[in-house]
Amino acid sequence: MSTEAETTSAAAPAPAPAPASAPARCQRIGCDATFTDDNNPDGSCQYHPSGPMFHDGMKQWSCCKQKSHDFSLFLAIPGCKTGKHTTEKPITKAVPTKPSKAVPVQTSKQSVGADTCSRCRQGFFCSDHGSQPKAQIPTATSDTNMVPVEKPAVPPPKKKIDLNEPRVCKNKGCGKTYKEKDNHDEACDYHPGPAVFRDRIRGWKCCDIHVKEFDEFMEIPPCTKGWHNADAA
């Protein structure tokens, strides 16, 4: 009887807590944040729903038309759409660039004016426009009384930096947040060379790695270590 009473009075073991989901990195373009399934509310992800366009040195997001010549500033353009984080890579289609309109070339001699005719401009006789005297180009006369005064160069004011202030590194391929007190000569992993976009090929000139897809380009690891720089050009 005492054994049955002890068994009845014993407390049941508490259920084991559910294992926490491992953090994952969002694969949406322009986000790159880490998240868990337990902490992924709607609106927590800010991203670009469509891919970039590259034409004549200009970088532009096809979804929101935001553009920049500088690649670091282009990547810093915030996403134009919000939603939930995801680990699925988006399928981006290459956006064709608009071909430049060809300017028709005038081949008829009758359409060429005397001011653009090569023979008239050189002072030779031209059967289409008659004899045209060569235009006299006025020569600029220097005024000896006008002496240019050189203004002394004003040095830029020195910027005061708080060692504990969070700053964002603008080195290409980094983009991390850091504090100046933790900065050192191996704190930053970045690409020193410019990005190369040519014939649908994307890559870095510094490490000579080139790929076709923009997602693969963003995953090229940096090739150089150095100091974080929040004022990089």
Curated annotation (Swiss-Prot):
Residues at which Zn(2+) 4 binds: H191, C206, C207, C223
Any one annotated GO CC term: nucleus
Keyword Transport appears in the UniProt entry: no
Residues holding Zn(2+) 2: H48, C63, C64, C80
Record domain CHORD: where: 26-85, 169-228
A GO molecular-function annotation: small GTPase binding
Compositional bias segments (type: Low complexity): 1-13
Biological process, per Gene Ontology: defense response to bacterium; defense response to fungus
InterPro entries: CHORD_dom, RAR1
PROSITE patterns, sorted: CHORD
Entry keyword set: Cytoplasm, Metal-binding, Nucleus, Plant defense, Repeat, Zinc
UniProt comment concerning the protein's domains: The 2 cysteine and histidine-rich (CHORD) domains bind each 2 zinc ions, and the plant-specific 20 amino acid cysteine and histidine-containing motif (CCCH motif), located between the two CHORDs, binds 1 zinc ion.
Assembly mode: Interacts (via CHORD2 domain) with SGT1 (via CS domain). Interacts with RAC1 and RACK1A.
Protein known as: Cysteine and histidine-rich domain-containing protein RAR1
Organism from which the protein derives: Oryza sativa subsp. japonica (Rice)
Lineage summary: Eukaryota, Viridiplantae, Streptophyta, Embryophyta, Tracheophyta
Gene (UniProt): RAR1
